């Protein structure tokens, strides 16, 4: 049987590398859990048991082994398989899994509601240190839930190298491999002793030794059982252990040591690069050449600012490389703080730095800043602290799909008191926004960065907070564009002119505050006003202008051209923008319908 499973693992690993090389995706963690997932499939019943992953980065093999093997080559493509687990995709997917820390809390709910079913949670070693996970562990131990099996996949990485005390705990447990055998021998010896007084003395000794040997003694004292597999890519080791713990009652934790990138030499050598990777050449491991991104522009500029001002600190929640901070981190390691997957903690830490006279920059993806709204309000806004927020991946992100799109942050930042919000429309404006941020002390400042290649305009005027810029001057129709939408509306400018839609185009990087002077004094020239943004339409930039119109008695038709849906699927960014009628011919048709009141 083991030879068959080994062959199966080889076939899955080959298929995985081929598909991800074409579509991009999360390769390293999935290569590491091939044997673990195959063995879980062998021992447990995926149809009857409830299997959860935290996070879904490591669930590709699970998709293949359930009901999606024939469609696996469509993963991350439009209308193909989702990049993460999705209950809308398969009955085997019990819970969505885009963000870290959700599986253990959800498992508690499943375990309570389904006492006769086994709930198996595969948790990454970075996710286990997340606050949600620790809260769930606290409850599981307190209630001694009998039907939960927690498998901690320790590959010593999240996206980059793991940080934090709990990660060090895991390393200590994994390295103390002889502990389990020692403990079993001690228990066996104690059980053979008849004298109660001697037995109690030895039991106290065993507990004392355990407190020194395993850092998880506190959890073990709450009723958890701990087991280790130190060769997590070895079927001969995995199968017997899973059989042993399958029917145990009470909360159980199995620590499995796997190798991220296992079986593909380039992924083994550069684990961070192959965590999440764009399409690449299998023979060389090299990705195909891409255009310069806004994240790169930010990374270069923040390094420059860091050299000028030693009070600048950068913070990221396990996303140093993704947010463009790797150069800053190398140059100023003592001023670049990686907090791990702990967004709320990151924001409050930054507030403490700001309160102490430092200049903190919280660099984080839009989808993850959602996890820190309480801290944004309570710790930053109410105290009006000058914390700078660099919100990367704002707008549609593409292949990572609905759990990762950055289409909510603008709405809640507009709602929170004291925040200034900038959405640069060009690479030059991004640099200017960062230059302004260095000495900005009026309160918290947000600078939003899209997942897009850079765009610039010749002879562009400098960025000013509270002031917009006229890019094209025309008549009848006014287009106010923020962020990426300036590039998009300029792409169709000539076609609009040719169709008789004459217009003025405004670059509006300053979203909060608005350019009230322009709105009060120049709006009356136009028959139609369009506000273009890559954000969910509710409580949007356009809504803020609409409210300003209402408050100031301005009676002009205002059309909000934004994302109509709050849940955008996965696919290429260009495809999704066109589907949302925010690009190209579909945008032109949308504008015509709004002007003429009918479909043309």
Swiss-Prot record:
Listed Pfam families: DXP_synthase_N, Transket_pyr, Transketolase_C
Q: Which top-rank group of organisms is this from?
A: Bacteria
**According to the UniProt entry, what is the EC number of this protein?**
2.2.1.7
- Keyword vocabulary terms for this entry: Isoprene biosynthesis, Magnesium, Metal-binding, Thiamine biosynthesis, Thiamine pyrophosphate, Transferase
The record's listing under SUPFAM superfamilies reads: Thiamin diphosphate-binding fold (THDP-binding), TK C-terminal domain-like
Tell me what reaction this enzyme catalyses. Answer: D-glyceraldehyde 3-phosphate + pyruvate + H(+) = 1-deoxy-D-xylulose 5-phosphate + CO2
Q: A cellular component term (GO) from this record?
A: cytosol
Question: Record-annotated residues binding thiamine diphosphate?
Answer: 57, 98-100, 126-127, 155, 264, 343
What would you give as a GO molecular function for this chain, any one? 1-deoxy-D-xylulose-5-phosphate synthase activity
Q: Which residues bind Mg(2+)?
A: 125, 155
Keyword Transferase recorded: yes
Cofactor(s) annotated in UniProt: Mg(2+); thiamine diphosphate
A biological process (GO) of this protein is:
1-deoxy-D-xylulose 5-phosphate biosynthetic process
Q: Bound how, and how many: what does the cofactor note say?
A: Binds 1 Mg(2+) ion per subunit.
Which pathway does UniProt place it in? Metabolic intermediate biosynthesis; 1-deoxy-D-xylulose 5-phosphate biosynthesis; 1-deoxy-D-xylulose 5-phosphate from D-glyceraldehyde 3-phosphate and pyruvate: step 1/1
Record text on subunit structure and interactions: Homodimer.
Briefly, what is this protein's role? Catalyzes the acyloin condensation reaction between C atoms 2 and 3 of pyruvate and glyceraldehyde 3-phosphate to yield 1-deoxy-D-xylulose-5-phosphate (DXP).
Q: Which family does it belong to?
A: Belongs to the transketolase family. DXPS subfamily.
Q: Can you name this protein? A: 1-deoxy-D-xylulose-5-phosphate synthase
Record organism:
Fusobacterium nucleatum subsp. nucleatum (strain ATCC 25586 / DSM 15643 / BCRC 10681 / CIP 101130 / JCM 8532 / KCTC 2640 / LMG 13131 / VPI 4355)
Q: What is the lineage of its organism?
A: Bacteria, Fusobacteriati, Fusobacteriota, Fusobacteriia, Fusobacteriales
Q: Which gene encodes it?
A: dxs
């Amino acid at each position: 049987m083991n030879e068959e499973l080994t062959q199966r693992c080889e076939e899955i690993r080959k298929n995985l590398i081929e598909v991800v090389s074409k579509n991009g995706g999360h390769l390293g963690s999935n290569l590491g859990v091939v044997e673990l997932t195959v063995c879980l499939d062998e021992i447990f019943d995926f149809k009857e048991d409830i299997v959860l992953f935290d996070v879904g980065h490591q669930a590709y093999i699970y998709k293949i082994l359930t009901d999606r093997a024939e469609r696996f080559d469509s993963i991350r493509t439009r209308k193909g398989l989702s990049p993460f687990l999705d209950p809308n995709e398969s009955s085997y997917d019990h819970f969505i899994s885009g963000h870290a820390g959700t599986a253990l809390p959800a498992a508690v709910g499943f375990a309570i509601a389904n006492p006769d079913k086994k709930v198996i949670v595969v948790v990454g070693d970075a996710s286990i240190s997340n606050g949600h996970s620790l809260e769930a562990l606290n409850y599981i131990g307190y209630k001694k839930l009998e039907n939960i099996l927690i498998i901690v996949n320790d590959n010593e990485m999240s996206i980059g190298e793991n940080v934090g005390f709990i990660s060090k705990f895991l390393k200590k447990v994994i390295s103390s491999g002889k502990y389990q055998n020692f403990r079993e021998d001690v228990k066996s010896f104690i059980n053979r002793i008849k004298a109660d007084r001697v037995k109690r003395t030895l039991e106290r000794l065993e507990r004392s030794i355990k407190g020194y040997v395993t850092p998880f003694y506190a959890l073990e004292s709450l009723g958890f059982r701990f087991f280790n597999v130190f060769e997590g890519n070895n079927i001969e080791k995995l199968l017997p252990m899973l059989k042993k713990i399958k029917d145990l009652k009470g909360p159980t934790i199995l620590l499995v040591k796997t190798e991220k990138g296992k079986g593909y030499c380039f992924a083994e050598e550069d684990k961070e690069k192959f965590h999440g990777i764009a399409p690449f050449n299998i023979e060389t491991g090299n990705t195909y050449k891409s255009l310069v991104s806004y994240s790169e522009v930010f990374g270069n500029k923040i390094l420059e600012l860091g050299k000028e001002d030693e009070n600048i600190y950068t913070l990221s929640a396990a996303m140093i490389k993704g947010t463009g901070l790797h150069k800053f981190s190398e140059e100023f390691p003592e001023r670049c703080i990686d907090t791990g997957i702990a967004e709320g903690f990151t924001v409050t830490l930054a507030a403490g730095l700001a309160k102490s006279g430092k200049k903190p920059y919280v660099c984080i993806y839009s989808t993850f800043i959602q996890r820190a709204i309480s801290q944004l309000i309570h710790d930053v806004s109410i105290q009006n602290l000058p914390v700078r927020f660099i919100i990367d991946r704002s707008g549609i992100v593409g292949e990572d799909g609905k759990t990762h799109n950055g289409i909510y942050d603008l709405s809640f930042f507009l709602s929170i008191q004291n925040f200034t919000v900038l959405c640069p429309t060009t690479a030059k404006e991004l640099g200017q926004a960062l230059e302004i941020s260095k000495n900005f002390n009026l309160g918290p400042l947000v600078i939003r960065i899209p997942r897009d290649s850079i765009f610039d305009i010749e002879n562009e005027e400098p960025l000013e907070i509270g002031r917009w810029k006229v890019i094209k001057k025309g008549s009848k129709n006014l287009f106010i564009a923020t962020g990426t939408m300036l590039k998009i509306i300029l792409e169709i400018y000539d076609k609009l002119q040719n169709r008789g839609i004459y217009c003025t185009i405004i670059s509006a990087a300053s979203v909060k505050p608005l350019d009230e002077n322009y709105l009060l004094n120049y709006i009356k020239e136009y028959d139609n006003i369009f506000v273009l943004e890559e954000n969910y339409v509710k409580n949007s930039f356009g809504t803020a202008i609409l409210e300003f119109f209402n408050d100031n008695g301005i009676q002009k038709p205002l059309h909000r051209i934004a994302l109509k849906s709050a849940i955008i699927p996965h696919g290429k960014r260009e495809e999704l923008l066109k589907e949302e009628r925010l690009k190209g011919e579909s945008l032109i048709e949308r504008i015509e319908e709004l002007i003429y009141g009918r479909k043309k």
